[in-house]
A protein has these predicted regions:
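Short amphipathic alpha-helical segments at helix-loop
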Residues: 29-33, 81, 142
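Conserved amphipathic alpha-helical segments that form helical-bundle/coiled-coil interaction surfaces
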Residues: 41-141, 149-164, 168
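Short linear motifs at protein or domain termini
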Residues: 1-47, 54, 58, 170
């Protein structure tokens, strides 16, 4: 519940303690309760991802990139299997993005990024046309530690989100 409460299965729901890693932030809570402007959220996500991929390329260890590569391979395998569900692909997509947050080695960026990604959870559809290709481009750029290509892929990905959103408004 975004750091406000902790749910402990079998024990109940409790107000989060100060030791909680994702402390409640009134500004983030304001985003939750206001009407969501998808275009504004997309702009925020774009800014965060552009900076995030730079941090990942600069900070991730080779071992972390191997784990990221394994996660991408799982995602690609699910997308290649026509019988796979969009739900499973979306789950792996989210895991990949959360892993990017972890391996940027900046807990503030990670927490904000994961928060923003969670706001997009219901709209994520990795089966949209072009999404798999742009994910592969972004991943390849990260694996090659190529900041310019990674930033280009983030821009391309953002355009796909905007187009998909516009298509739902028609």
């Amino acid at each position: 519940a975004y750091g406000v409460v902790e749910i402990k299965q079998g024990h109940g729901t409790f107000i989060s303690s100060a030791s909680n890693k994702r402390l409640f932030d009134p500004q983030l809570f304001q985003i939750l309760i206001q009407d969501r402007d998808y275009i504004s959220l997309t702009q925020v996500r774009h800014l965060l991802e552009e900076g995030l991929v730079k941090l990942v390329i600069q900070s991730a260890t080779d071992e972390e990139l191997i784990l990221l590569d394994q996660k991408m391979n799982e995602f690609v395998e699910v997308l290649a299997n026509n019988g796979s569900s969009a739900k499973e692909a979306a789950r792996l997509d989210l895991e990949y993005h959360r892993m990017l947050g972890r391996i940027c080695h900046n807990s503030i960026v990670e927490n904000i990024y994961v928060f923003v990604i969670d706001l997009f959870t219901k709209t994520i559809n990795p089966i949209h046309e072009g999404v798999d290709t742009v994910h592969q481009r972004l991943h390849s750029a990260i694996m090659n530690r190529d900041i310019a290509q990674a930033v280009d892929a983030v821009h391309e990905h953002t355009e796909i989100w905007k187009q998909a959103y516009q298509a739902t408004k028609k």
